[in-house]
Amino acid sequence: MKKLVCILVSLVMTFSVTGLAFAEKEQKNETPIIIIPGFMQTNLQYENEDGTFEKVWAPDFLGKLGIVGQNLPDILKSALEIFNDNTEAFGEALMDMMSDLMPKMMCNPDGTSVYKVLPYENDPAKRNMHHIKHSGEEYHMQGYYTFASYICDEGYAKEENVFIFEYDGRFDAITNAESLREFVKAVKAYTGKEKVSLIGVSYGGQIEAAYLHMFMDDNDIEKAVFNVPALLGTNFGDRILNARVEFALDDIVALIEHMSASDTELSTLLKDADPEFFSRLLNGLSAGISEYARYWSSVYSLTSVEYYEQLKEKYLDPVASAEIIKRNDIIHYEMMPKMKETLNECLNRGIYIAIHAGSGLDLVLGGDENADLLLPTEKVTGAVCAPRGKRFSDGFTGAGTECKNPEHHHVSPSMEIDASTAFLPENTWFVEGTPHAMFQFDSYGLELAAKALCTDELKDVHSDPEFPQFTTSKNVNFGVFAKFNESAPGYITKKDSSIIIENLFENNKIKVLSVKAKGLDISFDSESKKILSPGEQIKISFNGEIPNKNAVRAAVTVKYIKYDIISSVAERTFDLTVLNGEKGESDGSIVDNEYYIKDSSGMNIIKKALTIVGNLFDLIFVLSEFLTGDAFRYLM
């Protein structure tokens, strides 16, 4: 329940940054590291006439309870309209309150700030981790403090060599890339180093790409790691500004559980909630957002090209907003079309590139693309993906447009992603089931990012079998992780003779009840009475023959129960591809994914009425938590 706050917050501050935990290393990375946070993840301050500064973002809701009280009557009145199926009024009332709470965040039609609002000063002496940690500034760093502190505390980098780039999240990627250039120069001068390494998260990844597109000739980048980067945008601007939200509640529940990073099964709290309720609420919010943020140039930078022209025509005057249009035209018609070319040129010049993406989830605001909740996987990586509920046909081993090596298999175990078509097939990793920028809650994602940024161990997706191109999340809320003993996660070959199951819980023991395969004529010996402690593994052998086929879809489901508490039987299904024969014939056609499960059950009138009441109480709790500012420690 506590983390449900993300339902409201994430739609304003869509692109969050992650924290990453790393194992201790004997030698610290000597190259300065610059962290580029995600959308609205940096601090903004208003300069008063007397030269003092007032923090305006992230806002201090707890200190503005008077404004909340003034708006409360309208909020309560509009809340009653929910029972008349008018959720939009409630959303509009909430948006009015948000406008009162953050009046200085408005921008002019040309994209400049109405008020003198500035990012924190990008002084390397103040924006390095040593200064930040010892000046008591941890809270103001929001969520990405976790990322920076881990790479320092676990020995990957020195505190004085890790820097945070502060920028105005309302501004476009071109403007922020120009500011990043100045910060890179300042960090080089401060450290005496000739090059720096960058890691950009979400919108920070788009800013990073803009920097490389415009300033690669500066020759000052050693590594560029992209964590769920918004390289080609998303449908956020279209869905919010045009009030076309279709809420993906099931995947929001997954996000809540992921953020909890606990053994608690939070999905039961919202299993009967009505997605339409939240869709109407958010569309009510959208009416206010479209006026409040229509001149935030970043909204257009984050919009994918298929929606950009329509939004530009509807919300931007060609004269008054000429500067917003000019800079975003560069992004959509110069930078994005040349993304593959830019990234490959980086590799040719010796710049290390790694792209980390999430997959296997819906777009939270609506759409049928394979995504990480906020960004379509295809627009993060360039890889062709089947729509949700679909997959490539059996026998498909990749179109091979970017990787033509017949020995490389770049199709995901779910047969939904063809990484052979990605911008960089050999330098792109996918983690299924990890929500957008939530790698700090996933042990695999943490170590993957650590190795890419701070070591030379992962030159490409073939460097280490422990870090294959495709895998599934190891967040504790999933309970178990499974792979076959001789193959990469998600694949099975004739070499395999057993399945390895790991208990992901941190506090609970489990007992595996059964393991069953679909699409394979094999059976598992699951009569073991062994109880798995947290982190412990068990190897279960199977009987039967692996078919002599290649690139054939299958799945395996593990059922288990928590051993030391009263709980229901839980299960997790793992995507599986058989790789055990000659290369088959496939035209790459898209077929229905028989392994895709989407709850589409309806609700009767009584159940719907009870759900509305429950949703309303949920939102009251969400609002109270939101106002304390506690949410920002998770989402920022």
Which role fits each region the language model picked out?
Residues 24-199, 206-259, 362, 372-485, ...:
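N-terminal non-catalytic accessory region
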Residues 249-320:
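Alpha/beta-hydrolase-fold enzymes
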Residues 492-498, 550-554:
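Short, solvent-exposed loop/turn segments enriched in Ser/Thr/Gly
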Residues 501-507:
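Asparagine-centered strand-capping/turn motif at beta-strand->loop junctions
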Residues 516-528:
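Short, solvent-exposed loop/linker segments at beta-strand-coil boundaries, enriched for Pro/Gly
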